[in-house]
Swiss-Prot record:
Belongs to the RuvB family. Residues 256-346 are annotated as: Head domain (RuvB-H). It comes from Agrobacterium fabrum (strain C58 / ATCC 33970). Homohexamer. Forms an RuvA(8)-RuvB(12)-Holliday junction (HJ) complex. HJ DNA is sandwiched between 2 RuvA tetramers; dsDNA enters through RuvA and exits via RuvB. An RuvB hexamer assembles on each DNA strand where it exits the tetramer. Each RuvB hexamer is contacted by two RuvA subunits (via domain III) on 2 adjacent RuvB subunits; this complex drives branch migration. In the full resolvosome a probable DNA-RuvA(4)-RuvB(12)-RuvC(2) complex forms which resolves the HJ. DNA binds at R292, R311, R316. GO terms for biological process: DNA recombination; DNA repair. The RuvA-RuvB-RuvC complex processes Holliday junction (HJ) DNA during genetic recombination and DNA repair, while the RuvA-RuvB complex plays an important role in the rescue of blocked DNA replication forks via replication fork reversal (RFR). RuvA specifically binds to HJ cruciform DNA, conferring on it an open structure. The RuvB hexamer acts as an ATP-dependent pump, pulling dsDNA into and through the RuvAB complex. RuvB forms 2 homohexamers on either side of HJ DNA bound by 1 or 2 RuvA tetramers; 4 subunits per hexamer contact DNA at a time. Residues 1-182 are annotated as: Large ATPase domain (RuvB-L). This is Holliday junction branch migration complex subunit RuvB. GO terms for molecular function: ATP binding; ATP hydrolysis activity; four-way junction DNA binding; four-way junction helicase activity. It is found in: Cytoplasm. It catalyses: ATP + H2O = ADP + phosphate + H(+).
Length: 346
């Protein structure tokens, strides 16, 4: 099973694009309290000065609301919102077309900016810093440089991998914002709101059960809510109770920690095949037949946040929490081995 086929992948799928469930303001947005509070200040200050907001960089795992926050920012600034992604901007001309069509103080959102073509990135530097495009027209001896003035705009970019951004690009963002996984309480509020907008009767236990298995990710919470609704409707249930949510998600092979078959294969392979580790990421990728990027960006962030694995210079190792979840007996010297690897990491 590839990551794209998983119910709990945080990557965007067509069914996730339901604008009616998205919050429309920062006050309506649940979670990320510190980031929201700071963004409110920056937005209000920019509006009071009548200036474009400084460029913003959102950093964090997929599905935490980076696109939604960018849309809300444009709405609260009272400006137009245009959206694209790094892989889509293949040539300098593609970027030039986007930038020259922006009006004063507009917001341009670029998702996956770490996947931007290096040649395009070079064009972006003067656009962000001086609001100018410096293009080369023609070829050979007839080539000439043309400068095009741009409207003062705000670039809002998102990345799941800050380390892949070049230093010159990273330094041009005046407002870096790191987004964290959501708590179960925050996700419960999100599930309740989604159920209310769907006209779905939801008990406290039902909302809590869905939130517990959503891997700290609102996008996954919304997807699980829709699937649980299907089970509840077919069962002609008057409300989504904890029992109905538990039965539905168990049948969908999402366990009580939000792990699915691929997650369990990941943990089991390290435990059984490699004695709990350490094992390198390339070996894990080969064993799972999954791309390295998918493992590092999709599977491991939640595993680390939940304390299932540790990353060390020698590879991944399972923690006592992971062994307990698998129902397997950990090695007798597990704590000592982990301590030694931690010292090596330092």
């Amino acid at each position: 099973m590839s990551d794209a086929d998983r119910l709990i992948t945080p990557e965007k799928r067509g069914e996730d694009i339901d604008t009616t469930l998205r919050p429309q303001s920062l006050d309506d947005f649940t979670g990320q309290a510190e980031a929201r509070a700071n963004l409110k200040v920056f937005i209000e200050a920019a509006k009071n000065r009548g200036e474009a907001l400084d460029h913003v960089l959102f950093v964090g795992p997929p599905g935490l609301g980076k696109t939604t926050l960018a849309q809300i920012m444009a709405k609260e600034l009272g400006v137009n919102f245009k959206s694209t992604s790094g892989p889509v901007i293949a040539k300098a001309g593609d970027l030039a077309a986007l930038l020259t069509n922006l009006e004063e103080r507009d917001v341009l959102f670029i998702d996956e900016i770490h996947r931007l073509n290096p040649a395009v990135e070079e064009i972006l530097y003067p656009a962000m810093e001086d609001f100018q495009l410096d293009l080369i027209i023609g070829e050979g001896p007839a080539a000439r440089s043309v400068k095009i003035d741009l409207s003062k705009f705000t670039l809002v970019a998102a990345t799941t991998r800050l380390g892949l951004l070049t230093t010159p690009l990273r330094d041009r963002f005046g407002i870096p914002v790191r987004l964290a996984f959501y708590t179960v309480d925050e996700l419960e509020l999100i599930v309740r709101r989604g159920a209310r907008l769907m006209g779905l009767n939801m008990t406290d236990g039902g909302a809590r059960e869905i939130a517990r298995r959503a891997r700290g990710t609102p996008r996954i919470a919304g997807r699980l809510l829709r699937r649980v609704r299907d089970f509840a409707e077919v069962a002609r249930a008057e409300a989504v109770t904890r029992e109905i949510a538990d039965e539905a998600l168990t049948r969908l092979l999402v366990d009580n920690m939000g792990l699915d078959q691929l997650d369990m294969r990941y943990l089991t392979m390290i435990a059984v095949n490699f004695g709990g580790g350490p094992v390198g990421i390339e070996t894990i990728a080969a064993g799972l037949s999954e791309p390295r990027d998918a493992i590092e960006d999709i599977i491991e962030p939640y595993m680390i946040q939940q304390g299932f694995i540790q990353r060390t210079p020698r590879g991944r190792i399972l923690t006592a929490t992971a062994w307990k979840h698998l129902g397997l007996q950990p090695p007798k010297d597990l704590e000592a081995a982990q301590f030694r690897l931690t010292l090596e990491d330092d």
